[in-house]
Regions:
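Beta-lactam-recognizing serine transpeptidase/beta-lactamase-like catalytic domain environment
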Residues: 1-15, 20-258
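Conserved small/polar residues in nucleotide/adenosyl-binding loops
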Residues: 262
Length: 263
């Protein structure tokens, strides 16, 4: 009862993390909203397959978000970390680390809640230790869909919903009892923290989240008439039953509320 899971527990974000992967890839120039990738029930690499569910193919970014296509985001992640401009996969992962940190992952957000955890974002040094320095993109591919070594607190994942709703920035989460005018608020409480991704790249991601709820996709059960909900589902493997995650905000334009659930 003393363990506050919202800030202390660490869970793989699952497919909700695909939103971050798409944003980073667009900023790095290896993905555009209209690029289409084929999916034949999964992504094949090194004699293995990262499975996916049955859906239409090929998909552009918006539909890949709506349908939560594993193959699409595996390819996007590979293209990002193997970009020749980095010189090596190790350096590609290092650049990826910096982007992910800018979304508030892998570090404490600085809330008022006691015992806040930092979660985990795997680094090249982590993989060097795990694989004795011998690893490639296939070794880290599970991170493309928010599994593997990725670990986030529920608050960090809720913060991701706020970042996307705001098209690229967040405020440090705080507990508030009452507010009496902006002048009474400490300036720290309305300081914006921007990600490394330009706001224009959030547009197709938001559209994909909206389609997934309101048109066709894995988030259809979150539909609420008149609310224009945007959402993204996630499932992550676990030693026991799978973890299920869901993040959302509403309405699509000028959002007023976001939420995150972990089951």
């Amino acid at each position: 009862p003393q363990f506050n899971r919202s800030v202390k527990a660490k869970y793989p974000p699952g497919s909700t993390f695909k939103l971050v992967q798409g944003l980073i890839a667009m900023q790095e120039g290896v993905l555009t909203p209209n690029m289409r990738y084929s999916c034949h029930r999964g992504y094949k690499y090194g004699g293995r397959t990262m499975g996916c569910h049955d859906h239409a193919s090929p998909l552009d970014l918006r539909e890949a978000v709506a349908q939560s296509c594993n193959a699409d985001f595996c390819q996007v992640f590979k293209d990002m970390i193997t970009n020749p401009k980095y010189g090596s996969v190790k350096e590609g992962v290092r650049v990826w680390n910096e982007y992910v940190y800018s979304f508030g992952f892998g570090r404490k957000l600085g809330t008022d809640l006691y015992g806040e955890g930092a979660g985990n974002v795997p680094t090249p040094e982590d993989y060097d230790k795990k694989y004795n320095g011998r690893w490639n993109y296939g070794s880290v591919l599970s991170c493309s869909i928010g599994q593997g070594e990725m670990g986030c607190t529920p608050l960090q994942m809720a913060n991701l919903a706020a970042i996307i709703a705001n098209r690229g920035y967040y405020y440090t989460p705080h507990l508030v009892k009452s507010i009496e005018g902006r002048d009474s608020i400490d300036a720290r409480f309305y300081e914006r923290h921007y990600t490394m991704v330009d706001s224009i790249h959030y547009v197709p991601i938001v559209e994909g989240m909206w389609r997934g709820v309101n048109v066709s996709g894995t988030s259809r059960t979150a539909y609420l008439e008149g609310w224009d909900v945007c959402g993204k589902t996630g499932t992550a493997e676990n030693s026991g039953p799978d973890h299920s995650t869901f993040l959302s905000f509403a309405p699509k334009d000028n959002p007023q509320i976001d939420r995150k659930s972990v089951v």
